[in-house]
Each structure stands twice: as structure tokens, then as C-alpha cells.
Amino acid sequence: MVYQPAAGARDLLPLDVAQKRWIEDKLQQVFHRWGYHRIITSTLERMDTLMAGEAIQRQMVIQLQNSEDEELGLRPELTASIARAVVTRMANLRHPQRLYYNANVFRRIWENRHNRQQEFYQAGVELLGVGGLLANAEVLLLAGNCLTALGLQDWHLILGEAGITRSLLDAFPINLRAKVRSAIAHLDRITIDTLPLTDELRERARIMLDLRGNSADVLQKVSSLNLDAEQQEAVNNLKSLVELLESGGKFPIILDLSLIQTIDYYTGLVFEIVNNTDSQARVLGRGGRYDQLLGLYHPQGENIPGIGFVLNIEDLYQVLLSTQQLPQETPASDWLVVPENPAAHSAAFAYAQKLRESPDLVRVELDLGSTDRATIKQYARDRSIAQIAWIKADGSPIIEKVSQ
């Protein structure tokens, strides 16, 4: 019998890990430079915690039960877990809270594909306790800084505003609103043309479908929809944000007020980070503002504003593969320490440890019993080990540089 990983699971071998760590280390450096601190939440959550935001479908959660028959689930995303942790464990801390994570998530994918991946790796940030223009700009600029740090050039940010989109949908009859929303989310003009709408509402839906493109053009189009005071204020805030982002130089934005995320706890900004390739556009991450989510977990129901984004490590990996930036092999050891005979075993361990205690990271291997010097040298060449220390019984070393 050949034992394989469970369906939807996979192993990461040393080179996979080195490449994943390269991406994560670059992102972590950016998070630290912006003043964010890492948070680690439980992989297991109570199902009522995961379902509280009404944004996660129960069937996508991989569920478990404990000995008390309590329903548990493997987290399908991080924001709900962090929201729960912040209001229950960090309530006395001052805001804003700048948090980042680097973790795995689990999702049951209901598609007709055998062994569809169910474990994913993500990195992201949450900025909690503050709303407004500057907080929104910080998170978007931080996302752009992450991509720049990874050496990615051909990306853009698709920016929407869930509050504006929802309020524009309020003009439609309640019994048709969900269908109009779905049609706009999927850019489905045929459905818009066939729904039983008045001419005025049908034209409104068509305009909403076209609220995508250059920021100045989109803002002009949405202003033609006879907005009320609240909607106009939201549009003005969006305009101020775009102007701030673009004032610092080129920041690639596509404004899209038809952008509707599948996770429905967003109350303001929503965005996707997209990379352009010759063959397709790949979504590298997404995020948005969720000013009512934390209130669902707060004992007194107090709303705490929040905004964040997540980057998908696997998608970043696929894009970076073609750039030749990722490590192409695992790090080589610096030394191979070889006891020349059994009497030198203790001295060899001591010498290897002395090398390892260097202030700089030094990778040191000990030969574990090879008797043929030619075999030892070939091993060092195959593993790109720079130096061999041959240890005599009296502890004295003979250093040999390995020609590659």
C-alpha cells in the first residue's frame, strides 16, 4: 500500500518551503516597516464564530466535533478569527491596532474535480479601530508596497465601494434586487435586459454595469445617477482617496463600482489586487473595509472600524516563478566536518559546534560515517558545500576548499 496525503492536502518539500519562505519574508519585512505586529489565531474556531458575519457559507467549512459535541471548523479565512480575538482578548488596548498574519486556511471546494486543493497559505493585514481617508490610503499603499517588494511590475488595483454599490441597488424592487446584484457582479448584460424592470431602472442597471475604468470617467458616470446626499458624500470620499493615492506618483487603479465581493461583510471600500500576464489576469489578493464585523463579536455590540487585505501565497508563487527571483535550490551548507577516525568523533562534534556558534548563520554538517575520501568530496560537490574540515584525533583540523 502506498500512503498518500489526504484528498485536497499536499506536502511542501524543502525547495517548496524555501520558495514560500522567500515570499513570506519579503512581505513580513514590509509589514514590520509599516508598524504592524503579527497575530496568530487558532486554526480551529467554533462554528458560531465563523458564521457570525453571515459571509461564509457553512458548506465551505471543513467541520469537526470535539468530545462535548461542540461544532468546530477549520478557519476558511482569518478576518473573523482576528475580529473575535481583538474584541475578546485585546479590548483594553489603544487603537489603532495594526496586525498582520501569515497562516494557512482551509476551504471545502464543491466542484467536480478530484483532489481539489483545500489548504491554502495567506498573508495579510488588518488595521483596526480607525476609519477615514488616511486609514484607507495606508492599507492600499501598503498593499502596493508589498507587490513592489516582491519585484512585481504588471499589477493593478481594482477599487470599488460596497456602500455606494448597495445604496444604488436600493432603487430596485426588493424581489429583483438579488438578481440585479448577481447580474452586476457577473457583468451579465443579458439578465439585465430580460428582467422585468422599468426603462428607468434598466438604464440605471446598465450604467452600474459600466461603472468601471478610468477613475475620472467612472466618478463622472456615477454622479449622473441622481444621487442623494449620503451617496454623494461617499462618492466625494472615494474621489479624495483616489487623488491621494495618485498624488504620490503612479499608482495603478481601475475604479469599479460594479465590484461585489462574495464575502459580504464589507461596508465600504472593496478591492482586488490583479496581476496581468500574457495569458490571463490573476487575482493575487483582495480586501476591504468592514466597520460592522467586530461589533458582532463585541459583548456590548460596539462597532469598531476595520480595513484589511489578504494576499494568496500560491498565486504570488505562480507569478514569481517566471521572474527567476525565487530560490532555485535549498541553501547549501558552509562546512562539512569529517572525523578521520573513531578517536576523532568527540573532537569533530566540538569543532562543528564551534563553527555553528559564529555570530553569522553558518550551516554545518557532520559526516556520519563515510570511509572513502573521494565519496566525501563528491558529496560536498553535489551539495555545493564550500569547505571540508578533516578532524584528527587530537582535534586539529585540516581545511580543504571544495572545487565545484
Swiss-Prot record:
The keyword Cytoplasm applies. Its main location: cytoplasm. PROSITE patterns: AA_TRNA_LIGASE_II. GO terms for cellular component: cytoplasm. It comes from the Bacteria. Transmembrane segments: none annotated. Pathway: Amino-acid biosynthesis; L-histidine biosynthesis; L-histidine from 5-phospho-alpha-D-ribose 1-diphosphate: step 1/9. Coiled coil: none annotated. One of its GO terms (biological process) is histidyl-tRNA aminoacylation. Keywords: Amino-acid biosynthesis, Cytoplasm, Histidine biosynthesis. It is found in: Cytoplasm. InterPro entries: aa-tRNA-synth_II, aa-tRNA-synth_II/BPL/LPL, HisRS-like_core, HisRS/HisZ, HisZ. The keyword Transport does not apply. Required for the first step of histidine biosynthesis. May allow the feedback regulation of ATP phosphoribosyltransferase activity by histidine. Belongs to the class-II aminoacyl-tRNA synthetase family. HisZ subfamily. Heteromultimer composed of HisG and HisZ subunits. PANTHER family: HISTIDINE--TRNA LIGASE, MITOCHONDRIAL-RELATED (PTHR43707:SF1), HISTIDYL-TRNA SYNTHETASE (PTHR43707). This function is generally fulfilled by the C-terminal part of HisG, which is missing in some bacteria such as this one. This is ATP phosphoribosyltransferase regulatory subunit. It comes from Nostoc sp. (strain PCC 7120 / SAG 25.82 / UTEX 2576). The gene is hisZ.
